[in-house]
């Protein structure tokens, strides 16, 4: 990860940072997996997804599987770039304290 450091206020809140970090490690992730991994309610996760989707950071697909609606989420290129830049900015902050 060699992104230009850029602190991102949208990603920074702990819940969103956890969501984006989880999505960064995979291609498509099921809504239920994210919900269960982070211990969030459906409504809390949906609200965070709406914010991230509105910023263009995630993409959401709702394919029909076994007659049940599933929700799959992925990090977009914009979202991945923002996440990598945010992580780089956090590393710079931590490194400046260690000097």
What residue spans do the PLM features occupy?
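Glycine-centered, phosphate/nucleic-acid-interacting loop/turn motifs that mediate DNA/RNA or nucleotide
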Residues: 56
């Amino acid at each position: 990860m060699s992104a230009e450091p850029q602190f991102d206020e949208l990603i920074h809140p702990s819940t969103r940072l956890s969501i984006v970090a989880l999505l960064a490690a995979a291609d498509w992730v099921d809504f239920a997996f994210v919900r269960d991994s982070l211990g969030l309610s459906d409504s809390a996760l949906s609200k965070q997804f709406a914010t991230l989707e509105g910023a263009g950071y995630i993409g959401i697909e709702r394919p029909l599987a076994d007659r049940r609606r599933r929700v799959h989420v992925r990090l977009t290129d914009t979202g991945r770039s923002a996440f990598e830049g945010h992580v780089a900015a956090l590393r710079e902050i931590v490194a400046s304290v260690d000097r």
